[in-house]
Amino acid sequence: MVRCVPHDSSSTLNTDSNDHTLVRLTAYLQGAHSSLMESNRDRESIERPLVTVVDDDVSVRESLPNLLRQFGFSAHAFSSAEEFLTSDCVSQTRCLILDVVMPGVTGLDLQRQLKLRSPALPIIFITGQKDEGIRKRALEQGAVGFLLKPVISTVLLEAVNVALREN
């Protein structure tokens, strides 16, 4: 139903025309909103470096991205190396926070694979394993950090900032 508003007698109200205008206006606004959101995403990815977390522990995957976002980073999390490798995030990631022990492809295995694809990608390992041999191998293969869980947030944030600054 069309609401009638007072108008002068020289103009007429064409409901078909108004309905089509409303549809076109709605489509235009939806398009403008989509373009704005896309533009914001593009700007966000330029202004906010993507830090990716790969860890099989759900609590880490939930908490670390939230922490990173609070401090101005864009963040994504993956439950496995395989999931990360098949995502669009590999080429966009500017710093990788990586668990050492995961089912399937381990953190050290993923590090070796990424060195072939993205040799400059800084990797910070986080682990519950107090194994000096693993730490030594990770650092020898180019890791920029090796932190024990539970990770202290200020230490992790400093490691991320240093990794991004140096790369």
Residue ranges and their predicted role:
Residues 1-52, 58-65, 86, 116, ...:
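Non-catalytic signal-transmission and effector/linker regions of two-component phosphorelay proteins
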Residues 102:
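Receiver (REC) domain active-site loop signature in two-component systems and cognate sites
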Residues 109, 130-145:
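Alpha4 helix (beta4-alpha4-beta5 surface) of REC/receiver domains from two-component response regulators
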